Amino acid sequence: MSIRRIEVKNFKSFKELKIDLGKFNVIIGANASGKSNFVHIFEFLRDITSSGLDNAISMQGGREYLRNMNIGASEPLSIKVVSDQEFGLLGRTKVGLIGIKTYEATYEFALRFNKRGSGFRIVKDELSQKCKFLKLERKGRKIKEKEIPGEGEILISRSNGRVKIVLNIPPNVPLKKEVIFPPFLQEEKLPEHKLLLETPYFPPPLESIFSEISIHDFDPKLPKKATPITGKAELEGNGNNLSIILKNITENREKRRKLFNLVKDLLPFVENLDVEKFADKSLLFKLKESYFKTQYLPASLISDGTINMTALIVALYFEKKPFVIIEEPERNIHPSLISKVVEMMKDVSQTQKKQIVVTTHNPEFVKYAGLENILLVSRNEAGFSTISRPADKEEVKTFLKNDIGIEELYIQNLLEV
């Protein structure tokens, strides 16, 4: 799993949020409750890694719309992420190789905005890595691992505009910070508006947690149009380059077989999928239905639901990013297929090493999601968004014991009791 816990303060409609995430997470709530703002947290983190902090703030509408409007500049905006992503480092010492196995990482930063103007400063920027240590011995072609008793922590932080590195390790581990971080990287001056997340101090396995967040809000009208062949090789958030992705998939025999089997399971009338290339170097995907065995239907004539289902399958099974957010995946899909869509997502979260977050208004989706996977977003009397787990509420458990379905409680707005 990538992200185990997230905490935010003074971010959009949230005053304070602390929430644990599982492998499969279904976000529900009334209109304007804050579901999209929850998604914006991950979007903001991703944009920092790809475009830098200043641009990421601007892409959220600037400081005025990034922070909570009621709180404003009176409190810092902060985000804290806890990850249980495991990864390893090697350190060469006088006694041989020492393996460093990180099993938990916590990254936190806070921004304090000026009361006037658009200025801000970074008041906290800290990465903590909890780790175990291994002594590595080479025996022939094999490397033997022996765990060294005790655990440690690698702490990287911003202090007076410079990088500060602290190594808290057991005395029996012969490791110095110079082995992990070259001297020229220690106490280096950091640019004023640049987070550790944007620097080489952030280990690539951790940085990829944020940079490889994919957010999808599919618009079935866009894939119905011809796509220039020069588009991205990964699925866009709105799905407009679906034809390019399908072309790449169908050119590989094994991937083509897998795609067809997945589509056929949800849409039995589909006989084949293909992509047509035009003289103007554009692509348009097409499919053949069992009702018309000799004729393909172009994307422009394919139903919105069929396109949505195809895009969902591609995002879940063929895209490599480990953290996937899909907004309202049930749109244009018949209620009888919702249970299969939910099971598909659960399967991917368990077997494909992907963490999935879904937002929905659909009672059928809520019905099959599983109570333990549901997160309810609501607004309190002060207008701040809060997130709770209905599974933790005794009143909800009582309703369920009396054979009232979770979807009925959702429709009647009883999950907030």
Segment roles from a protein language model:
Residues K23-Q60, D304, M309-A315:
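Phosphate-binding glycine-rich loops of NTP-binding sites
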Residues K340-V417:
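C-terminal lobe/lid and adjacent interdomain/linker elements of RecA-like ASCE P-loop ATPase modules
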Residues E16-G22, A315-F318:
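Phosphate-binding P-loop
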Residues K12, N25, E43, E330-R331, ...:
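Catalytic acidic motif of RecA-like/P-loop NTPases
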Residues L97-N261:
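Electropositive, glycine-dotted interaction segments
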Residues M1-K15:
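N-terminal pre-Walker A segment at the start of P-loop NTPase domains
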Residues G237, N241, N261-F318, F323-S336:
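Conserved ABC ATPase signature
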Residues H40-R121, L134, R141:
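Conserved P-loop NTP-binding catalytic core
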